[in-house]
Structures are given as C-alpha cells and as structure tokens.
Amino acid sequence: MQAPRELAVGIDLGTTYSCVGVFQQGRVEILANDQGNRTTPSYVAFTDTERLVGDAAKSQAALNPLNTVFDAKRLIGRKFADATVQADMKHWPFQVVSEGCKPKVRVSYRGEDKSFYPEEISSMVLSKMKETAEAYLGQPVKHAVITVPAYFNDSQRQATKDAGAIAGLNVLRIINEPTAAAIAHGLDRRGAGERNVLIFDLGGGTFDVSVLSIDAGVFEVKATAGDTHLGGEDFDNRLVNHFVEEFRRKHRKDLSWNKRALRRLRTACERAKRTLSSSTQATLEIDSLFEGVDFYTSITRARFEELCSDLFRSTLEPVEKALRDAKLDKAQIHDVVLVGGSTRIPRVQKLLQDFFNGKELNKSINPDEAVAYGAAVQAAVLMGDKCEKVRDLLLLDVAPLSLGLETAGGVMTTLIQRNATIPTKQTQTFTTYSDNQPGVFIQVYEGERAMTKDNNLLGRFELSGIPPAPRGVPQIEVTFDIDANGILSVTATDRSTGKANKITITNDKGRLSKEEVERMVREAEQYKAEDEAQRDRVAAKNSLETHVFHVKGSLQEESLRDKIPKEDRHKVQDKCQEVLAWLEHNQLADKEEYEHQKRELEQICRPIFSRLYGGPGVPGGSSCGAQARQGDRSTGPIIEEVD
C-alpha cells in the first residue's frame, strides 16, 4: 500500500489562542481540537498529577492560578529586565524568575518546583496543535509553518523556531501574521488585478499593520509596522483595574493581592468585553468573589471605550507609519482587512473607518482563523503542492527593523534598511580605528535610532588576527544576510588574510543553545510519556470503578437475585464494598494496582457467575461481555463494557 503523502500544517501560535490548518484537495481545513473548538487557548497548567494544555488548562485556571501559565508569547525572546516583562508580571498570577538574564516561569508540578523557559511553554502549545492535526489527518505531522507578529525582532523569531523544534516539528518557515492573513484574503481574488491591501491585525497580545500589493498570486509586502505588546489582554487589564477599584469603593476590601479572585474577575472581564462588541451593556455576576462578598455590577460600552481610549487611538499610529513607509496615500488602499479577535470591538472599527474617510472595512475573512489559513497555504507551497490554486503563489516579505553595527562613537551604521524585501544580503567595508589594531569587535543592532545605545543589541563577536597596520588601512568586509524566516547571520572577513568569523546571532541576547534545545526536546518526550501514563492510570481506575458497579448492579437484578446463593451474594457484595473503600483512599494509585484489584474481584466473581451462566463469566467488565453472550440468553442480561 502506498504511504500517505507527507503534509505540512500551518500554525498560528497566538498570545491567547492558537489555531492549526492544513491544505489538501485544493482547500484549507481549519482543524477542531478534542473539545470541538477550532481555536485552542494558549494555556499550560501543571497539577500534582498531570500537565494540561489548551481548554482543559484554561478551564481550571481559577482553581490553580499559580501553576496555570499563559501569555508565553509576551515572554518569548525577551530579557527578564525588559520593561514590558516587568509590567506584565504585575498582572500574572504565576511566578516569573530570572536565570542568566532570561525569564523563566516557576511552577509546582507533581509536588516538585520546576522552571520552564517561554520556548518550552510555547512548545507544549505547539505539541497540542500537532496532536490536533495528527488526530484529524490520521498520520504523523512533522513539518509546519509557524506565524509570528510582523514586528517580532530577531530574538523572538529564533525563540519561536526553537519552540517548534522542541515540539518535534521541522519548522519550514517562520512567516509574519499579517502576511499570512493577506494570503487568506487574496487567494480567491486572483482575477481582480493589482490591489493595495492594508492588513490591520489586532489580536490578544500583539498588533501589526502591513501594507501589501497583491497581483496574480504575488504577495509583496511594501511596509510593516506595529506593537508587539498591544492587544485584547491590555483591554482586559483596564477592565480588571476598573473593577478592583469599584470593589474597593463599594466594599472597602482590596482583592488585588488574591490571585484566585483576580483570575475569576479576569475571566468575567474577558466575557464582558466580548459582550460589549454586540451589546451596549454587560453585567458581571461573581458569587463570593472575595471574603464571601458577591460582586454584581455592570459596565456600558461607552465606559469601556473611555477606559481604553488611549490604547484604541494608539492603533492608528502604526497605520500612518506603514502607509508612509510604503509611499502610499490612504486613498490608494483598495482593501482594509480586519484580522484578530480584537478587531470586533466597534470603537476600533469606527476609528479605522474614520481614518480611511468612511471607507467600508473588509470583514470577509474569519479574524480568528485567517492567519492559520494563510500559514497552511504557505506550508503547502513549501512542500511543493501542485494544486493550481497555490502553484504560482509567491510571498515577498520584509525585514521589520533596520539592521546595522556600531561604529566609532556609538553610531548606528545601517546595512539593511527596515522594510527591505527578504531574503536579502548586504555587504559593506569597514576599517580599523587605531594604529596596529589586532582585531575588531563587531556589535550587531536592530532599530531606527541614530545611536546604538537606543537600539536593541542582537549579538557581538570579534575578528582577531588582523596584521599590524596604520589606522584606516585594513579592510574588513561585513556581510549581513537575512533568510526567508527573517533571521540574521553576520560575517566579517579581513580582506588581506581572508580570515573570517561568522555568527547567526548568538546567546548574548537570550537565544537557546543547540544543547539546550536538544535537552528540551528530550524533556518534552518525557512529559509526553508522563501524560500518556496518567491517561492509562485514569483509564484503569475508571475500568475498575465501572466493573464494580456492573457487578453490584447484576446482584440487584430480579432475575438473578434468587439464583445466587445468599452466602455467595454476600461474598461478592463485601468484596465490592472493599474495592470501593480502597478506591476512595487510593485515588492516585498506579495503573498496576487498579488492575490487580480488578483481577481479585474477577477471581471471586468468576466461579459464582460461571455456575449461573454455565460458562466462565462475570457480568460486566472487560472479560464478561462476550462470555455472557455465550450463555443462555434467557437466563440473564447481556452486559457490555462501558468505557
């Protein structure tokens, strides 16, 4: 039999929700998870017995706030000292600690303190998306295209790629979220001629604006702008702060230090925010929120808009910047396309529509699924799919930030300008600053400011062994090379000796080493094995419980009650009670212990019921359904196993 063709999936790894899609038979399928939902919460929870990912993790967040981790995307590729990380830590119930300047999340798992890098948490979400795809496709999934905000910097892109590797995925490409959404928008509009499209992507935690021209399957990004720290979570934070103050005013109690109360309030605020997109008022009803006090209140859409007015208005600045960089007037934009759940907020839509002089906004694509849709198409293209729809599709993306190095006096010398089409390669010649200088120290930065101290340091390396010469004589050739993922490598070569040194930006800025990634891959396998062992344990426990109740139920059957001797009936009943009592006190026993208890019960029941049925049978449980069927059908009920 022919092996199934390998398929690659597209994964939208979101701040609050993630989504996976696959392109096959000429169309994209967005895949539902085991709960039937097409988006999965980007949540991971750790308990005394197991690890939960997705819906199961989010649904128990209020009961287990310290060990339920979310917002990993707001940590990934950042340093612990980053101002945004410090600000976010005030809102997170879980603990974030610093290890070698990198943030790690500290939780309690199976009674032990564990700490995880953001890449590891994200890899657990990616593994969940991988499992969702495998369940649908019925075959292993090894390849994926993963999306990131267009304004993610080099560190954040590489960290996302590492997360994919830890999840056991070959990451074919890291692509920008608004570009993926543009593919979703433009794929079925091929005959429309050249169109300028502005993608306005406001999600749970990040905000991007990209301007593209789309023509006959060529998607060319003209400019991109955004804020990697603006989204629905920030609107939730404003609501939470508002209601904490209201609670303090009304009840003279401060709930801000109680993690569980805050989690319950945040969940209610998120629900209220969604309600306000379709209604002008939302009510919150939270029983016994804090110290026995019930919290019943309401909020109007106008009040919500006023609380977030500065955040909503700030979304227009990147729109103006992207248009300026693309050298386009707003009148030249054919389609303004809304992507991301937060674009459902009426005030955001109104501000954007007014900015474009009343132009109708394009809401034709599903804002929650568009990014995964586009990623799935790009995955098919990279796997060489011959479908006519995607065969000629070409994606030309850009570098979101200028890249350069530090020269004398701390000046930023730019080699690659922002919005340069990628992949790209630029070379420039530099020289020494002093006589007989034995080496040069090359520091690589990204950003738009004139001085390097105001930009983001990506990495540094040294080119040594330069022959002694007066200042200005040696010629050092520096090459910046950005690949299609937007990841940078830098090479420096001394032209007189041919000596070279190269970095694909190193650990200086918080990137995981190859060894660390390999260790995390091994640990991810171990966690997966532990999860499977936990599932088997629960299945064995359920099987034992079901078996006991089957047996007890059979003893109550009128047709059997008089046929079983009283002594035997008491013997079976006593054993059932003994097993139930054991179960009550051994909720966390091993799979083997549950199976042993079940075998003991079967050994007592088998001779009693075999006399009754005229064959070796026990009503109920795994060993009895078939045997009961072999007996005389008129003597008793057929008992099936219930999983």
UniProtKB/Swiss-Prot annotation:
UniProt cross-references to SUPFAM superfamilies, sorted A to Z: Actin-like ATPase domain, Heat shock protein 70kD (HSP70), C-terminal subdomain, Heat shock protein 70kD (HSP70), peptide-binding domain
GO molecular function, one term: ATP-dependent protein folding chaperone
Region of interest: Disordered: 617-643
Segments forming a coiled coil: none
Superkingdom per UniProt: Eukaryota
Binding-site residues for ATP, renumbered to this chain: 14-17, 73, 204-206, 270-277, 341-344
Keyword Iron-sulfur applies: no
PROSITE patterns named among the record's database cross-references: HSP70_1 (PS00297), HSP70_2 (PS00329), HSP70_3 (PS01036)
Region called Nucleotide-binding domain (NBD), residue ranges: 3-388
Region feature Substrate-binding domain (SBD), mapped onto this chain: 396-511
Pfam families cross-referenced by the UniProt entry: HSP70
Keyword Nucleotide-binding: yes
Transmembrane portions of the chain: none
Signal sequence bounds: none
Modified residues (N6,N6,N6-trimethyllysine): K563
Keywords assigned: ATP-binding, Methylation, Nucleotide-binding, Stress response
Domain notes: The N-terminal nucleotide binding domain (NBD) (also known as the ATPase domain) is responsible for binding and hydrolyzing ATP. The C-terminal substrate-binding domain (SBD) (also known as peptide-binding domain) binds to the client/substrate proteins. The two domains are allosterically coupled so that, when ATP is bound to the NBD, the SBD binds relatively weakly to clients. When ADP is bound in the NBD, a conformational change enhances the affinity of the SBD for client proteins.
Family matches, as NCBIfam families: PRK00290.1 (NF001413)
Family to which this protein belongs: Belongs to the heat shock protein 70 family.
Summary of the function given for this chain in its UniProt record: Molecular chaperone implicated in a wide variety of cellular processes, including protection of the proteome from stress, folding and transport of newly synthesized polypeptides, activation of proteolysis of misfolded proteins and the formation and dissociation of protein complexes. Plays a pivotal role in the protein quality control system, ensuring the correct folding of proteins, the re-folding of misfolded proteins and controlling the targeting of proteins for subsequent degradation. This is achieved through cycles of ATP binding, ATP hydrolysis and ADP release, mediated by co-chaperones.
Full protein name: Heat shock 70 kDa protein 6
Species of provenance: Saguinus oedipus
